[in-house]
Amino acid sequence: MKTGSEFHVGIVGLGSMGMGAALSCVRAGLSTWGADLNSNACATLKEAGACGVSDNAATFAEKLDALLVLVVNATQVKQVLFGEKGVAQHLKPGTAVMVSSTIASADAQEIATALAGFGLEMLDAPVSGGAVKAANGEMTVMASGSDIAFERLAPVLEAVAGKVYRIGSEPGLGSTVKIIHQLLAGVHIAAGAEAMALAARAGIPLDVMYDVVTNAAGNSWMFENRMRHVVDGDYTPHSAVDIFVKDLGLVADTAKALHFPLPLASTALNMFTSASNAGYGKEDDSAVIKIFSGITLPGAKS
């Protein structure tokens, strides 16, 4: 198996997670290629040592041993792979495709079947950990797929992941685990926002409330990470409100298919949907706190 600079990997989607993954591949010594519609992101990756960048991965597809797709949703994944300028038709048979977007299990299965038609192996491999862990090559990967897919993607997984969980051999299982994880993530953010909103209404300084919770049993990773943005009055999007409208929608769809009630997740989805409807969809997901009326939130620090 190829290793180091002999191994060519392309990353499609150079947002916070995709850029982190791409930079991790560069640091690991892999010959790294990147594609994104954002020319600034492409320039950043090229300056960091990528072999090449483009707004379309098809331009370098034939060079690749593996492709990592980390875009927003299933529609974008399908467009990248099978659209008018889709990359799948340009990849060498046997190339491994790691789909790391948060998508429905059924979409993962459909994409895997379509890729197989091109002689390509797919690893259903959604990721978590946030931008910092992505940048440090320490993402958590929830993966399902064939032994061949895992083997062919080993250099990429070693470069980008701190932990790799092998969920099973069938595409779709990894996506299901990620969707369940997103249930918890969304509920934690919504609950944190509700708690901080109540503190604001009660006249408790939010920096004090934050300090207490992060040093007590009620803390969670999402509270500590996202409610810091509220305290700082900084809603620059690291993960936007609309992402959780999408992800909690996938949670709801999964539960509906299984005839399973999810009262907390349903409430969280309603909260994020309300925030999006109020015009906060492109802000950081912590902006869900803005749906509460009658409170004063901290402003951005100069």
Swiss-Prot record:
Organism: Escherichia coli O6:H1 (strain CFT073 / ATCC 700928 / UPEC)
InterPro entries: 3-OH-isobutyrate_DH-rel_CS (IPR002204), 6-PGluconate_DH-like_C_sf (IPR008927), 6PGD_dom2 (IPR013328), 6PGDH_NADP-bd (IPR006115), HIBADH-like_NADP-bd (IPR029154), HIBADH-related (IPR015815), LtnD (IPR050006), NAD(P)-bd_dom_sf (IPR036291)
Protein family according to the UniProt entry: Belongs to the HIBADH-related family. L-threonate dehydrogenase subfamily.
Keywords: Carbohydrate metabolism, NAD, NADP, Oxidoreductase
Gene3D superfamilies cross-referenced by the UniProt entry: N-(1-d-carboxylethyl)-l-norvaline Dehydrogenase, domain 2, NAD(P)-binding Rossmann-like Domain
Name assigned to this protein: L-threonate dehydrogenase
Function: Catalyzes oxidation of L-threonate to 2-oxo-tetronate. Can use either NAD(+) or NADP(+) as cosubstrate, with a preference for NAD(+).
Domain of life: Bacteria
GO BP terms, alphabetized: organic acid catabolic process
This protein's encoding gene: ltnD
The protein's Enzyme Commission number: 1.1.1.411
GO MF annotations in UniProt: NAD binding; NADP binding; oxidoreductase activity, acting on the CH-OH group of donors, NAD or NADP as acceptor
Positions annotated to bind NAD(+): 7-35, 102, 246
Pfam families: NAD_binding_11, NAD_binding_2
Catalytic activity: L-threonate + NAD(+) = 2-dehydro-L-erythronate + NADH + H(+)
Active-site residues per Swiss-Prot or TrEMBL entry: K178
PROSITE patterns, sorted: 3_HYDROXYISOBUT_DH
